[in-house]
Amino acid sequence: MISISFLNCFFLVFLFLFFSDVHGSYNGLGLKPQMGWNSWNKYACDIDESIILNNAKAIKEEGLLDLGYEYIVMDDCWSKHERNATTGRLEANPDKFPNGIGSMAKKLHDMGFKFGMYSSAGKYTCAGFPGSLNHEQIDADTFADWGVDYLKYDNCFNEGKSGVPLISYERYKRMSDALNKTGRPIFYSLCQWGEDFVWNWGNTIANSWRISGDIFDTFSRKDVRCPCETIECFALQGDHCSVMNIISKASFLSSKAGMNSGWNDLDSLEVGNGGMSFEEYKTHFTMWAILKSPLILGNDVSSMSPMDKLIVSNKELISINQDIGTNPAALIWKKKYGDEYIELFSGRLSNNDWVVAVLNAASEPLKMGIHLSDIFVDALGNAEHDWLATDLWNNNVKLVSDRIRANVASHGVQVWRFQQYKVKNTNDKFFSFNKH
């Protein structure tokens, strides 16, 4: 009998050989991570046309559309519980969407947005509404007729068609092919929860792919409903996953994303939903930005506080997230401190700039000194230069010749944009940190 591990390995080798010469997005979309808003984190099933349009209106009035938040994505619970008995098509719940989905899509388009829909690659959606498994083409045609620009495609009630990468790939490819046959450009966002090594094959059929179970509005609290701590646990991702849990999984996947493939999706943002502190939300947004996750708001934008708006409006971090042609920042090291970790990330940007971030997951503030030889471990020639480092939260600029010093709050992050200044003489370099 052929083992599951053998099938997994065979399929991964097949993908590498078959797609090694593929360049660019599979459908020409998603050359940078998508930005927008999704209804699920805040509203779950409690959605209707007014909620969707009011959030879109607030996004535009707050200037967030101008910053790139262009997709308005309606999540689960929008449809009737049964398909149309005559046509077989999905239909909107008339109590929630009395004017129909196409009418709402037109209103969003007229406001300058792109419109996103939700379905599942299963018999039912996660909330028990009709799914698209075995109905891919008729549903894709319906979405295209409604003017849909984006599809979030979930993984619930998949009838056991998972557990082996090839099986999951084929199930999700059916909708990919169906969307492409419509002739309408539709961004394809897999919500496959990181199962079956989706980061190894998602880029061949989609524009982004989830790498974890559902996010929960907490920084680092462990939850038995999110049993996986690392990406190796690929078959039981669960939900109620903390920000740090998801960062831990994403940290090892920087090579799997980019303009020539697609994007690791760390799930929608929780900023503004009230479960974390200001410092923790800053860390949440910073790490999503530099890891080049999609930046999808998940709050009630119409009641967003000035501090929450400050976080999601950080133009410098958004520009790094949207920097075309660059890959996610990479985890350089992860050092134990107490029960938690201190982590260093760096990544190349356009014009030979770099993004550098130090994350302090510990329960106390720390003073740190990070040396250039650590930051540029993959490009040591850069350690021979002086650098101008701009703090991307307070805009302070400092000259860095040997190491950069930082006071990092508990559950906080310090993030800089490094710009080359001049060549210098080298000194001995080391890493150190001390209690604040």
From Swiss-Prot:
Enzyme category, top tier: hydrolase
Residues with glycosylation annotation: 84, 180
Organism: Schizosaccharomyces pombe (strain 972 / ATCC 24843) (Fission yeast)
Localization per record: Endoplasmic reticulum lumen; Secreted
E.C. no: 3.2.1.22
Name of the molecule in the record: Alpha-galactosidase mel1
Primary subcellular site in the record, as a coarse category: endoplasmic reticulum
Active site: 154, 214
